[in-house]
Structures are given as C-alpha cells and as structure tokens.
C-alpha cells in the first residue's frame, strides 16, 4: 500500500514503552480528537511493543495481553475507528520483538490475517533480532505480501533504522514507508 502523504499520528513507545493498556490507548485517541490534532491530519493511533502475551495461542496466533487489553484488539480498533481515527499496531521481522515478545518471523501470513481481522490500518514492523542468515529485503517483502493478501489495506512501516543499507533495497519490498535512522 502506498500513500500520497506521510501518515501522522501518535505512537505509544517513546512516552509509555511497555506501560500500555486499553484505557491509555483510548485516552490518547480521544486526546487526538479533542485537541484538534485529528482535524490537522494526525489520525493514526499506534500501539507499539509489549501488547501481546509472551507465548502465541494454541492456534499459532498472537494473543493480546488480557490484563492490558481485556476486550481484545478488535473492540479497541472499533472504538478508535468510531472516533474517525486509524488503528496501528507493532510487530517485528526478527526472532522476537525488541522487548522479547513473539515476532512475526515466518508467521507473516497468519499475523497479517489476524491484523486484518482486528481492523488494523497500520503496521510498524521492527528489525530487532534479525536472523543473520536472512536479508532484510526478504523479511519486509514477506510481510508486505502477506498484508497485501489479507483482505484489508494495511500500511507497512518498515522500522529498520537504516541498518543493512536499507535505502538500497527497501523500495523493492513494497513497504509504504521506512525509518532511515536509529532512535
């Protein structure tokens, strides 16, 4: 998916890191709306790392932490969409996420379908713990292909921090945008 202008919005990581939950995300979404930022184009609400349990479900799917997100991601997405905003989530192309939760490596199709079912509009896809025997280009292309076939338009944000000469290969992956530097 390609967009005409860069998406703008709010991401939970820099302010809250792993200290996130449904109430905080909804409070932040409402603040975008009530402050007028949404009217100025800031319409993405993105949950970063640490939203899942440390193990996948028996069906192989990612599972939201029920203590943090008791109603699940679909209900949260529906509420964010009702505010006229877009819902974003986080996953990782490496062996695990940066905070050591389950990643989407080799589970791209399952996770893309799950994200689509939950109503996700944006996926921040990180680069932590990348297997040494896999190329970044391959990892991002796999997720983009899975998202493109999920039945829902989901913008892929490749968060590779400019590692591995990202600028030389990222366009070929179909990613809608990419991060060019580290924190």
Q: Which residues are covered by each model-predicted region?
A:
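Conserved structured core elements
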Residues: 4, 19-22, 26, 70, ...
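Second-shell loop/turn segments in exported
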Residues: 12-20, 64-66, 130
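Short low-complexity, flexible loop/linker segments enriched in glycine and/or proline
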Residues: 102-106, 138-141, 171-172
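Aromatic-lined carbohydrate-binding/catalytic grooves of carbohydrate-active enzymes
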Residues: 28-132
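N-terminal hydrophobic targeting/anchoring segments and the immediately downstream early-domain regions
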Residues: 1-13, 45
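Active-site and adjacent substrate-binding regions of carbohydrate-active enzymes
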Residues: 113, 118, 130-145, 158
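Glycan-recognition surfaces
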Residues: 107-110, 152-183
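Extracellular/periplasmic catalytic domains that process cell-envelope and extracellular macromolecules
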Residues: 1-4, 37-40, 80-82, 116-117, ...
């Amino acid at each position: 998916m390609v967009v005409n202008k860069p998406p703008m919005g709010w991401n939970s990581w820099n302010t809250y890191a792993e200290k996130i939950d449904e109430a905080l995300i909804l409070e932040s979404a409402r603040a975008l709306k009530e402050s007028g930022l949404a009217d100025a184009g800031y319409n993405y609400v993105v949950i970063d790392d640490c939203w899942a349990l440390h193990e996948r479900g028996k069906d192989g799917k990612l599972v939201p932490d029920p203590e943090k997100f008791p109603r699940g991601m679909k209900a949260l997405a529906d509420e964010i969409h009702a505010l006229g905003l877009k819902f974003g989530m986080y996953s990782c192309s490496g062996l695990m996420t940066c905070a050591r939760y389950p990643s989407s490596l080799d589970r791209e199709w399952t996770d893309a379908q799950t994200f689509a079912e939950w109503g996700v509009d944006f996926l921040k896809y990180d680069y932590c713990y990348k297997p040494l025997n896999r190329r970044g280009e391959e990892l991002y292309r796999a997720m983009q292909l899975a998202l493109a076939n999920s039945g829902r338009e989901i913008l892929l944000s490749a968060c590779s921090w400019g590692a591995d000469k990202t600028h030389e290969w990222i366009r070929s992956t179909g990613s809608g945008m990419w991060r060019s530097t580290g924190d």
